[in-house]
């Protein structure tokens, strides 16, 4: 099938879309099901199999500024185009793209980093084809509340960093961390003042892999999204130089985030469009081939109408994601609706669940068989409803923005 384009895409964007699609088709899809089905979840991680290929074609470093050796692509729309094609290959591998965007966002936030930090870590990232980064926020009793965020002293990060001279001594535990144990640099949110909430008492540290006192716990055995490894990180008197702190001490999560150019939510949303597109295309081809009652499935109204809804859902979600991405890219020229990024992400995630479920129904009994990818698409879609804060917290965030516009404030129960 032809790739989705519109009249506003540049030749460069069409070319990188085609590149990402070819990588997904030739490199990701042939191994996705095998990795997904691995008995040990640690063996499902995509980077040992695909990391060097992503580096060869330039996708791993596309977000890194040119002055540090990267591709210098900084517009969100192009990242969403790539995210959709990689998501069409497999939802889990999109974390490779997010690693590139995240280290760029952190390092290029001049209020948080120094020139020396940027030179050191961006250069290291570009030179090492297996260099990935991880963000460590979630803990056993601190997850979704960090999104709004909850600012009470009884919540938020419980991982502590106590200053001792030129070092912080870090103790605590993180969980659900993407790429943990493989990534070479970790952006870790810690509590540096336990008498205050995370808006006044939290800080952000960079901790390289191999730092004494840092170890890794169990690999989480997930329902879906299995090609992206998630694992626990354990800090036991981990000694981190003060120079590895980003921004001032106790800068707080809200102020830290205010300096980070957003967009990862929309890249994730674009990946969900790619996932749904894969499920729709599989169902369409199956409906064209399989016969029941003397005619092809697609000729039965119940199936044909379901495919119409799936087609409409995928294209509507893509249009919404693209509109939101372009709004961010052109924020100096057009008014920015702060609700649109979150709303587009919500729509794309819920759409992917509908479309993958409908694809399962069209395949019937064959849909639940593990030799076909349809059940994997469904698992991946529903797994992502509980990622990055979960769908309910995303809705609460958009609701809070609606309330703010109405002159009200969202209140926690």
Features from the language model and the residues they span:
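A short core secondary-structure module
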Residues: 171-215
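A short, Trp-centered hydrophobic/proline-enriched beta-strand micro-motif
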Residues: 129-144
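Internal helix-loop-helix
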Residues: 55-132, 179-185, 328, 332, ...
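Glycine-rich beta->alpha junctions and the first turn(s) of the following alpha-helix
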Residues: 5-16, 215-315, 384, 406, ...
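C-terminal helix-coil-helix/basic helical segment that borders enzyme active sites and/or dimer interfaces
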Residues: 29-41, 284, 288-295, 311-347, ...
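A structural signal for short hydrophobic beta-strand segments in well-ordered beta-sheet cores
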Residues: 161-162
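Amphipathic, small/basic residue-rich leader segments at the start of a protein or domain
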Residues: 1-97, 120, 401-413
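Glycine-rich phosphate/cofactor-binding loops in nucleotide/flavin-utilizing enzymes
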Residues: 82, 363-413
């Amino acid at each position: 099938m032809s790739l989705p384009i519109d009249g506003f895409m540049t030749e460069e964007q069409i070319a990188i879309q085609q590149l990402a699609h070819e990588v997904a088709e030739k490199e990701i899809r042939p191994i996705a099901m095998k990795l997904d089905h691995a008995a040990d979840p640690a063996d499902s991680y995509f980077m040992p199999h695909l990391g060097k290929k992503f580096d060869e074609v330039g996708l791993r470093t596309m977000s890194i500024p040119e002055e540090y050796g990267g591709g210098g692509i900084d517009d969100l729309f192009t990242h969403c185009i790539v995210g959709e094609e990689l998501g069409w290959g497999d939802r889990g591998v999109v974390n490779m793209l997010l690693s590139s965007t995240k280290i760029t966002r952190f390092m290029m936030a001049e209020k948080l980093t120094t020139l020396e930090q940027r030179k050191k870590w961006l250069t290291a990232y570009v030179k090492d084809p297996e260099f990935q980064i991880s963000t460590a926020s979630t803990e056993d009793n601190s997850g979704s509340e960090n999104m709004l965020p909850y600012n009470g002293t009884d919540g938020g990060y419980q991982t502590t960093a106590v200053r001792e001279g030129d070092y912080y001594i870090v103790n605590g535990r993180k969980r659900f961390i993407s790429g943990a144990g493989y990534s070479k640099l970790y952006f870790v949110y810690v509590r540096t003042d336990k008498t205050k909430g995370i808006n006044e008492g939290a800080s952000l540290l960079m901790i390289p892999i191999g730092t004494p006192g840092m170890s890794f716990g169990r690999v989480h055995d997930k329902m879906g999204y299995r090609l992206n490894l998630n694992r626990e990180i354990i800090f036991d008197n981990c000694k981190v130089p003060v120079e590895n702190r980003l921004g001032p001490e106790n800068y707080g999560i809200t102020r830290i985030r205010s300096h980070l150019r957003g967009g990862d939510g929309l890249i994730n949303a674009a990946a969900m469009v790619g996932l749904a597109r894969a499920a729709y295309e599989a169902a369409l081809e199956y409906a064209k081939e399989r016969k029941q009652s003397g005619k092809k499935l697609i000729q039965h109204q119940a199936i044909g109408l379901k495919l119409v809804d799936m087609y409409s859902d995928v294209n509507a979600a893509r249009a919404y994601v693209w509109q939101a991405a372009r709004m961010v890219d052109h924020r100096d020229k057009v008014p920015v609706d702060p609700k649109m990024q979150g709303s587009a992400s919500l729509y794309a995630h819920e759409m992917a669940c509908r479309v993958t479920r409908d694809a399962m129904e069209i395949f019937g009994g064959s849909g639940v068989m593990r030799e076909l990818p349809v059940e994997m698409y469904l698992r991946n879609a529903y797994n992502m409803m509980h990622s990055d804060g979960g769908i309910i917290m995303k809705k609460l965030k958009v609701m809070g923005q609606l309330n703010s516009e109405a002159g009200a404030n969202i209140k926690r129960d």
